């Protein structure tokens, strides 16, 4: 069971950027700039999406989840599958997840969502107040 907290959706930012591209104020080469590392992560760790690429309109986008957090140590900054995220959410107290949509055809990529996962705050709803003895 995943408990997403502090969810941030970047849909408005995405929409504004695409409006700039469609109006010709931003170049396609400026927004289709996925690195080879991101494209490989999409191939091996990505989850297929039902949304078609807004730039090339040739294939469905792939969602890649990147994890960051002090507690993750060597795993920080790596792409993870949804199954791995579920397992990590039960093992670690708190870490951030950034979901990026990627088109493997034209290299379009954009941050879609970010949220926090982990065991912090799961279970008993203990008061944050502590006595002086603690």
Put a short name on every predicted segment.
Residues 53-56, 103-106:
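Short cysteine-rich clusters marking metal-coordination/redox-active sites
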Residues 36-50, 91-97:
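Short, flexible, mixed-charge glycine/proline-rich loop motifs
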Residues 1-36:
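N-terminal alpha-helical interaction blocks
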Residues 50-51, 57-93:
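Short recognition patches in nucleic-acid-associated and regulatory proteins
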Residues 2-8, 113-134:
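C-terminal/domain-terminus segments
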Residues 59-63, 109-115:
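Short, non-ligating residues that shape and space the ligands of small metal-coordination modules
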Residues 82-97, 104, 109-113:
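Short metal-binding segments enriched for Cys and/or His
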Residues 1-15, 42-52, 59-64:
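Interaction interfaces in information-processing and related assembly proteins
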């Amino acid at each position: 069971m995943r408990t997403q907290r502090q969810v941030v959706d970047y849909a408005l930012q995405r929409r504004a950027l695409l409006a700039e591209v469609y109006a010709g104020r931003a170049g396609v080469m400026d927004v289709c700039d996925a690195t080879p590392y991101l494209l490989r992560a999409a191939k091996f760790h990505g989850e297929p999406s039902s949304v078609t690429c807004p730039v090339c309109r040739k294939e469905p986008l792939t969602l890649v989840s990147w994890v960051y957090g002090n507690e993750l140590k060597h795993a920080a900054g790596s792409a993870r599958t949804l199954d791995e995220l579920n397992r990590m959410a039960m093992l670690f107290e708190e870490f951030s997840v950034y979901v990026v949509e990627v088109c493997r055809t034209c290299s379009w990529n954009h941050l879609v969502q970010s949220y926090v996962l982990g065991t912090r705050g799961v279970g008993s709803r203990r008061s944050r107040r502590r006595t002086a003895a603690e």
